[in-house]
Amino acid sequence: MKIAVYGKGGIGKSTTSCNISVALARRGQKVLQIGCDPKHDSTFTLTGFLIPTIIDTLQSKDYHYEDIWPEDVIHKGYGGVDCVEAGGPPAGAGCGGYVVGETVKLLKELNAFYEYDIILFDVLGDVVCGGFAAPLNYADYCVIITDNGFDALFAANRITASIREKARTHPLRLAGLVGNRTSRRDLINKYVEACPMPVIEVLPIIEDIRVSRVKGKTLFEMVGSEPSLNYVCNYYLGIADQILSQPEGIVPKEIPDRELFSLLSDLYLNPIGGGGQKKNKKEILLGFTRI
């Protein structure tokens, strides 16, 4: 099974992906996590350091695939999760989609691509071009990480459009949304009511999730010295169980941008029950300028 994890930049995709990967490994799966981001920090919390990228390795070998061994590019992470970082082209040059393609090509050359029960692609930010939608070409399921805010749900909506487009030619389905570090879910609920899709899990605001990223450890590793964090791991184990159940998934139909703006801004301007999230129109419009 191949899973592509998408979501707005900075939403916590890599931290979530690493913990899901360990949870899947705890369920007896052989897991490979592939970081698809030029920052090459997707697997940091699994390995504790920035591993060499596929592109760096290919360049050092002058693109002679026959000179590369699996141990040159596949690094063992916490919990037995294997880790690969695709890397990326120089800033302002090249295509990230090409890098993903080269990564898959090399793993196939090494007879490694089909050795895993689960391959998880952790993909940077929003889908802004066909290149960064490339992991969807290989995925069975897409999981979207979001929170209860405008920007993240707008990004999620754009990603659903990419899933729908890729599903025309690939057996791809959306497994659902994962809400990360959010104290409310009213906007999430409003969005999935208008654009029906499963909500796999919504994680509350837990400071240790953020701290784990800084420490370079998964929650599962931290629980060894802090048993009180075991309840947090159960969230990720629950997500893993839902993925392993091979859900039917859906091909979503995105909401037009203006309709989504109206939908979410209406909830902000007229919050259910009053108070809480009420903002003036100027604040909302300023929020949308950041999209």
Curated annotation (Swiss-Prot):
Q: At which positions is ATP bound? A: 10-15, 39, 180-181
Q: What is its EC number?
A: 1.3.7.7
Asked if the Swiss-Prot or TrEMBL record annotates the protein with the keyword Membrane, the reply is no
Q: Where do the annotations place Mg(2+) binding?
A: 14
Q: What is its main location?
A: plastid
Q: Show the disulfide pairing.
A: none
**Xref: NCBIfam families:** DPOR_bchL
Q: How does it assemble?
A: Homodimer. Protochlorophyllide reductase is composed of three subunits; ChlL, ChlN and ChlB.
Hey, which family's this protein in? Answer: Belongs to the NifH/BchL/ChlL family.
HAMAP family associated with the record:
ChlL_BchL
Q: What is this protein called?
A: Light-independent protochlorophyllide reductase iron-sulfur ATP-binding protein
Q: Which organism is it from?
A: Pinus contorta (Shore pine)
Source lineage:
Eukaryota, Viridiplantae, Streptophyta, Embryophyta, Tracheophyta
